[in-house]
Amino acid sequence: MVGLGIMGAPIVQRLCDKGYDLTVWNLEPDYYDRVKDSGAQWAASPAEVWTASDIVLVCVLGDDAIENVCLGKSGFASAGKAAKLLIDLSTTSPEATLKLASRLKDETGARWLDAPISGGPKPARDGELTVMVGGDSAVFKEAEPLLRKIGQNVTHMGDLGFGQKTKIINQAIVGANYILMAEMLATCRAAGIDPDLLPVCLKGGLADSAILQRIYTQMSAEDFDPPRSYVRQVNKDLKSVTHFVDDLGLDLPLMDVAIRQYHRYADAGNEMEDGASVSRLYQTTDAPK
């Protein structure tokens, strides 16, 4: 595994519990403390992870980061030819996926699956993630037993890049709902409704959702420490949504408004706050415009 962040570390712990021998690397070496007790072995570089492993999982922050671990100094390609399988759990652009998969195959012979994940740290630790996979169907079948150790819902969405396309749509739904939950929390408070009763009342109805039960509840309790996700990550993903939609020639005004609101919160110096803390935008007397 390369990447021991909010999602990478619990995935390592989960796979070690399931009997896998893992070699790991992270840009900040002190992150190894998160998984040391699980039995994972530290490597000095991505190249060392590549050399030591049959399957390499990557869970890093965006296009630049995955390009660096693949093609940068001491990256995977520097380790030379090897018939490896790379599974990219990161949220990256479909364009970067196609470009890097082609380059890495040319330089090392490696196969590639884009398999971005959704669910959060606890589902990652418990093996209950949602995994959306793009790539060759035979390669997917080879990797599926491993992916099902970390995901309760693993779906092959199509060719290489289709996992990332699906994740962009996932993030659009999540990001828009962050704003909707924040606005409905503010509405409950303004109307004198006990905000904690809303998810109880709506449970099982058409308005119920995982986001209502988890994210809205987190917002209502102002339970943002430690972060379960970072504003910078959600904001980055929503920028990807904008590019994706623009490239398709679509006009989605509801999505545009939600994205602008989230950008506004991120740009106010909140990038390292919990992603759900965007509800703080609405803790003023004047609703944001």
Features from the language model and the residues they span:
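Conserved beta-strand segments of alpha/beta enzyme cores
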Residues: D21, Q41-W42, L85, R111, ...
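NAD(P)+-binding Rossmann beta1-loop-alpha1 motif at the extreme N-terminus of oxidoreductases
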Residues: M1-C59, K84, S90, P121
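Rossmann-fold NAD(P) dinucleotide-binding segment
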Residues: P46-R111
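Rossmann-fold dinucleotide-binding core
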Residues: T92-Q171
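Helical "substrate-binding/catalytic lid" subdomain
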Residues: F162-D286
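Amphipathic alpha-helical hairpins
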Residues: I6, P10, E48, I55-L57, ...
